[in-house]
């Protein structure tokens, strides 16, 4: 498996991405970030892709039921600083990556 540039994805990228994916899932399930208007929405984190230098994490998310997707993605982007703060208490890495939230469109093609 390779990323966009053609460089193979390292084991470290996969491992850190999986740690962040699991931690984000728990944050959303327990609503630990206390994001307004998201308490009633279940959010699925389908994948987290890490950059080569582990400074950027692209989290692909999908709201359960598929309604208000764009609104939820915008809310996650708006509160990414708060999510990152809660994430820093769960994931111990040298540099916590910047979080970029993207809508997972793989469900539409499946």
For the regions a language model picked out, list residue spans one by one.
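Charge-rich, low-complexity N-terminal segments
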Residues: 1-56, 62-110
């Amino acid at each position: 498996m390779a990323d966009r540039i053609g460089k193979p994805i390292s084991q470290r990228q996969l491992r850190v991405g999986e740690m962040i994916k699991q931690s984000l899932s728990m944050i959303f399930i327990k609503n630990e970030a206390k994001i307004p208007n998201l308490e009633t929405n279940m959010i699925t984190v389908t994948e987290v892709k890490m950059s080569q230098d582990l400074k950027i994490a692209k989290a692909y998310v999908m709201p359960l039921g598929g309604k208000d997707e764009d609104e939820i993605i915008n809310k996650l982007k708006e509160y990414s600083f708060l999510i990152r703060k809660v994430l820093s208490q769960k994931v111990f890495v040298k540099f916590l990556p910047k979080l970029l939230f993207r809508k997972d469109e793989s469900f539409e093609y499946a």
